[in-house]
A protein has these predicted regions:
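An N-terminal assembly and electron-transfer interface module characteristic of large anaerobic redox
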Residues: 1-461
């Protein structure tokens, strides 16, 4: 990838910070290695597309050390769970066999699994040796009769967030707009209800949590053309250009896709979240507002009133147990504010939140929810996190899996909120699961036990 192409991806017109004198995303600082590379970002953005063969072109470690690190779920094909790599060795590099190995890997994947398409992820070694993956993908597509999409995402290009944008750019250039959606099936048509086509961008169906919300879309007459990329299929991605409205769930990841769909196809979009009662209701209201259908607006308000009444009845016992507990939230992106809203719905007090991967829009939403004097944390080192827990007198640390052992070694209750988790928290029904996990964590008898002096210390005293 050329330097000018990387600079263009870093410069996102849809971000508000582009209006400042120094526009574009901040470049990574030397030594700031935590957080993943461009390859990691591109792979986790596209890997949930379930019926595609995902081939990592590079040494075995690039695939082996990162495969399936996003806990997405599929309702059908499980092809995306199969790790494929060209497994480049030192001899392959010396002899210049990289392109040949890639071509044969694509053929083998097509012959063995008959995928809907093949995605090829470029990594550092073949990028440095100059393998022309675009030419190889084009030749393989002509011979195999299957779409082969090059994703040029070598790790040294930049950060994980840049990789997300590279993935979105590849989808827009090579996939979106290459097929038309099927007509609405008769079973989905109801008298007096107009079916509207919508997309979700940056929704990854972690732990199957989007399935909590999907029935509500069906009830309202909203047909999801594509959820990029949780539980998605290749053909669904091809038809995204025919939606009437888009919802961006994770702004920092795939905002460029929403912006280009708006520019080229005049599809309006909004940024929202399905975490928490308030934000879930607001997301459906935003869809109704963008689609400008009075009947849809009426159905939406009726559905929201019903679901909120039902979930509030279920949450009241949990709120009695959780009210007043202090939470330190260290995550990033959309979760830095959407999880805050969900926790506040449960009566917890969020004393500080992490903003290491949050956009300017995310930070503005945090201030709107928590107030102008809210504490934002950018240093995620173990020492800094433990210091923040002590300073703000937090009862629990909610963060990603990499911070789990930091909390447990310090005998601090911990709840995993990032992509590796096993529980889904989206939608109205997801709130009961979030409340249950918080209560189980905070009320576990293990914390009282581990904070007691060891028996030999007591005996010695």
């Amino acid at each position: 990838m050329q330097t000018k192409d990387i600079a263009e991806l870093l410069n996102e017109p849809a971000c508000t910070h582009n209006t400042k004198s120094k526009s574009g995303c901040a470049r990574p600082k030397p030594g700031a290695t935590a957080g993943g590379c461009s390859f990691d970002g591109a792979q986790i953005a596209l890997l949930p597309i379930a019926d595609v063969a995902h081939i990592v072109h590079g040494p075995i470690a690039c695939a082996g050390s990162s495969w399936d690190n996003r806990g997405t779920r599929s309702s059908g094909s499980t092809l995306f769970r199969i790790g494929m790599t060209t497994d480049l060795t030192e001899q392959d590099v010396i002899m210049g066999r990289g392109e040949k190995r890639l071509f044969h890997a694509i053929k083998q994947a097509v012959n063995t699994y008959s995928p809907a398409a093949v995605f090829v992820y470029n990594t550092c070694v073949p990028a440095l040796t100059g393998d022309d993956i675009s030419a190889v993908c084009k030749a393989a597509a002509e011979q195999c009769g299957v779409a082969v999409v090059p994703v040029d995402c070598a790790g040294f290009y930049g950060t994980k967030n840049l990789g997300n944008r590279i993935a979105g750019d590849a989808m827009f250039k090579h996939v979106i707009g290459t097929a038309e959606p099927l007509p609405v099936p008769p079973a989905s048509q109801r008298d007096g209800i107009t079916v509207h086509d919508v997309n979700l961008i940056g929704e990854y169906n972690i732990a199957g949590e989007f399935w909590n919300v999907l029935p509500l879309f069906d009830e309202l007459g909203l047909r999801i053309l594509c959820s990029l990329s949780g539980d998605a299929r290749f053909r669904e991605v091809q038809t995204m250009h025919r939606a009437q409205a888009n919802m961006v769930v994770c702004a920092k990841a795939l905002l460029n896709v929403a912006r280009k769909l708006q520019t080229d196809y005049q599809i309006p979009f909004f940024e929202g979240s399905f975490y928490g009662v308030t934000d879930t209701s607001q997301a459906f209201r935003e869809f109704a507002q963008l689609l400008n259908d009075p009947s849809l607006t009426a159905r939406t308000e009726a559905m929201i009133a019903r679901e909120e009444a039902k979930i509030n009845t279920l949450l009241d016992p949990w709120r009695d147990q959780l009210r007043g507990k202090r939470v330190l939230l260290y995550t990033g992106g959309v979760k830095s504010w959407s999880i805050v809203s969900a926790l506040q719905d449960l009566g917890l007090e969020v004393v500080a939140t992490g903003t290491n991967k949050s956009t300017e829009e995310d930070k503005a939403r945090i201030r709107e929810i928590m107030g102008e004097k809210t504490k934002m944390i950018t240093d995620g080192s173990p020492k800094a996190l433990l210091g923040a827990v002590k300073e703000y007198q937090a009862d629990i640390l909610i963060a990603g899996g990499r911070n789990m052992y930091t909390a447990l070694k310090a005998r601090i209750p911990f709840l995993d909120i990032n992509q590796e988790r096993e529980f889904g928290y989206e939608g109205y029904s997801g709130m009961t699961e979030l409340a249950r996990q918080l209560a189980l964590t905070l009320q576990s008898p293990v914390w009282e036990a581990v904070r007691q002096p060891a028996p030999w210390v007591i005996n010695h005293a």
